[in-house]
Curated annotation (Swiss-Prot):
InterPro entries: 4-PPantetheinyl_Trfase_dom, 4-PPantetheinyl_Trfase_dom_sf, ACPS, Ppantetheine-prot_Trfase_dom. It is found in: Cytoplasm. Keywords: Cytoplasm, Fatty acid biosynthesis, Fatty acid metabolism, Lipid biosynthesis, Lipid metabolism, Magnesium, Metal-binding, Transferase. Belongs to the P-Pant transferase superfamily. AcpS family. This is Holo-[acyl-carrier-protein] synthase. GO terms for cellular component: cytoplasm. Its cofactor is Mg(2+). It catalyses: apo-[ACP] + CoA = holo-[ACP] + adenosine 3',5'-bisphosphate + H(+). The lineage of its organism: Bacteria, Bacillati, Actinomycetota, Actinomycetes, Micrococcales. Mg(2+) binds at residues 8, 50. GO terms for biological process: fatty acid biosynthetic process.
Length: 115
């Protein structure tokens, strides 16, 4: 059963400027394993986190580090803890599906939550 679908797009250049202008933003949005990635990859991961938030109804108290994008042999994976995990469990989410891409200055992510 599909619990929810979320989609988000991020302007890569604008996102990069925000990271440069705002000290500590990279640390607030990303876990240590994500922080060293290039701007295109960070923009796609932020789009994925936004898409997860949309699936869950943008839960109050959501910490951006409670959701991170890992990689395994099959591609990107969504990892959750804290508030994001609690809300996902309350909605019956058992499995996440993620597709990310970037082209023409735009990063995009689509998230499907399955129960």
């Amino acid at each position: 059963m599909i619990v929810g679908i979320g989609v988000d797009v991020v302007d890569i250049e604008r996102f990069g400027r925000q990271l440069e202008r705002t000290p500590g933003l990279r640390d607030r949005l990303f876990v240590p394993a994500e922080r060293e990635l290039n701007t295109r990859s960070l923009a796609a991961r932020f789009a994925a986190k936004e898409a997860v938030a949309k699936v869950l109804g943008a839960p109050a108290g959501m910490n951006w580090q409670d959701c991170w994008i890992g990689l395994d042999q099959n591609g990107p994976t969504i990892q959750v803890k804290g508030t994001v995990l609690a809300v996902a469990e309350s909605k019956g989410v058992k499995r996440w599906h993620l597709s990310m891409s970037h082209d023409g200055g735009i990063a995009t992510a689509t998230v499907l939550a399955e129960g």
